[in-house]
């Protein structure tokens, strides 16, 4: 201010005092109402809070969307878990069925192996039963002093005559053969011998279902020896 006044004195010496006073009048100061300033501050604060609220709303909306996505994923996971649980139950049932089938197979194998182990005993029993059934039947054996074709009929004759001796005690003069020895050569020879008919050597052999032919002997009542014995001698 002093500098300005000095300059004014130098430059405006000729001017009026009033004009100088008017020029040197202090500038009016600006005054602000506190209430107005306070209201302006309120407006600025309200704008900031509004922005914050908007941001919060956006964040909430995003969170809601994320939560919905999470719920959807959870529902899918629950469905998948239910499917997995059903699959596990199905697998358990299949395992039970397989265990039951394996038990059945093991039992069948055991039952199948037991008869195989008992097979020798059963075979022995069957052999014994076969022996008992074969006892009344005829078994061919070689006779002492006979061989060839006449050997088998003689053995058959012995077998057929043995039980008759035990049962009847004495033999009939004429031997009656059953169906088992209808074509028994020895029986035919013995019957012919008892009746007085001695067959020839040709009658010792018979073919097919023909009966042996008997002829009257020329000399004595003796049974001729077979050809095999005569040749061996």
Curated annotation (Swiss-Prot):
Record bears the keyword Translocase: no
Top-level taxonomic group: Eukaryota
Gene: TEX35
Keyword Heme appears in the UniProt entry: no
UniProt-listed PANTHER family: TESTIS-EXPRESSED PROTEIN 35
Coiled coil: 45-111
GO cellular component, one term: nucleus
Stored InterPro entries: Tex35
Protein name: Testis-expressed protein 35
Pfam families (UniProt xref): Tsc35
Keywords: Coiled coil
Region (Disordered): 199-233
Tissues where the protein occurs: Testis-specific.
